């Protein structure tokens, strides 16, 4: 064999060895990346929601929305996103603001590349805030548009809540209720400072003044909260159309009892809205409920491939009742709630 042929053979062997090594490294990186995305546990949840015009208003400025990804990578890295928004502003501006907020947040949240849930939520909220603010500046009829926004990301066995305004998130656990969020309102600040009692705040003519919202300023800083979930927990997101008529003790009686939990989130959401309307229904009313059915810890990375086989039953209640079960593989599941 000539020196030239020997050199070519050596180069070929070296290239083959390098390719094998490269392929092995790439494979190892892919496996490591897959395992890094693997959730430590998987939470089965039942969802029910209802939005209602109320007994007085002509337009429904409330919106709820959520997205439960069917793609394993999105589910593992971003979790499931749920939200309630209560728009404000004349000439249908409130409807537009709440709709823009929910759609923009969901799209931006899942598009963001950050590995931190809070960072992605902050980015998504900033995108929604900027869009609504810019729209309000360009169109005179929408000058005062804005919206509250209360979001919950279900990630593994935790709920990460991002919040602006006076819509609320509650935790119902073992017959007790805890308000997760703190209202961004003038009366809430006065109560916090001791200047008003709760009873005075409820009767104050300034009780509807919001001190922080989406779209009314160039920038907004949401508050963040973390809830460690237990099996049997019930999470409730709602607009102030509910809490303006129902006290926490009313909510826990109607939504936190064993019979209410057994009835399911959809029936409970309808009951809460019904009672709020019976007590006057002065505002639009929106309720979204998450029932934490099971928290299953994953032992092996391979088990993640089977997540989509697990049932994720979904039930929406709008002006007419509709029911949707788990979607086909390869499609994200979302539902947008509105009454127009």
Model-based region annotation:
Residues 1-340:
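PP2C/PPM-type serine/threonine phosphatase catalytic domain
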């Amino acid at each position: 064999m000539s020196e030239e042929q020997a050199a070519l053979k050596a180069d070929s062997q070296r290239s083959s060895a390098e390719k094998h090594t490269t392929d092995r490294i790439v494979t190892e990186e892919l496996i490591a990346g897959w395992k890094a995305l693997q959730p430590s546990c998987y939470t089965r949840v039942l969802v029910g929601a209802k939005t209602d015009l109320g007994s007085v208003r002509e337009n429904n400025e409330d919106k709820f929305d959520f997205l439960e990804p069917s793609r394993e990578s999105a589910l593992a890295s971003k979790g499931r996103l749920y939200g309630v928004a209560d728009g404000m502003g004349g000439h249908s501006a409130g409807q537009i603001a709440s709709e823009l907020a929910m759609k923009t947040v969901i799209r931006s949240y899942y598009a963001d590349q950050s590995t931190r849930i809070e960072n992605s939520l902050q980015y998504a909220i900033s995108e929604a805030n900027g869009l609504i603010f810019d729209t309000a500046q360009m169109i005179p009829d929408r000058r005062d548009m804005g919206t509250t926004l209360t979001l919950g990301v279900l990630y593994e066995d935790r709920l990460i809540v991002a919040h602006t305004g006076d819509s609320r998130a509650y935790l119902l656990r073992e017959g007790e209720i805890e308000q997760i969020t703190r209202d961004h309102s003038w009366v809430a600040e006065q109560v916090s400072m001791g200047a008003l009692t709760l009873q005075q705040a409820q009767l104050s003519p300034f009780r509807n003044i919001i001190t922080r919202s989406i779209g009314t300023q160039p920038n907004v800083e949401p508050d963040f909260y973390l809830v460690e979930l237990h099996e049997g927990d019930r999470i409730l997101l709602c607009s102030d159309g509910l809490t303006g008529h129902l006290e926490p003790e009313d909510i826990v009686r109607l939504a936190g009892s064993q019979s209410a939990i057994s009835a399911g989130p959809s029936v409970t959401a309808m009951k809460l809205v019904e009672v709020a309307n019976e007590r006057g229904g002065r505002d639009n009313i929106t309720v979204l409920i998450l029932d934490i059915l099971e928290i299953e810890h994953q032992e092996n990375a391979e088990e993640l491939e089977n997540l989509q086989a697990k049932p994720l039953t979904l039930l929406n209640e709008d002006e007419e009742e509709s029911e949707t079960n788990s979607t086909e593989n390869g499609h994200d599941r979302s539902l947008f709630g509105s009454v127009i």
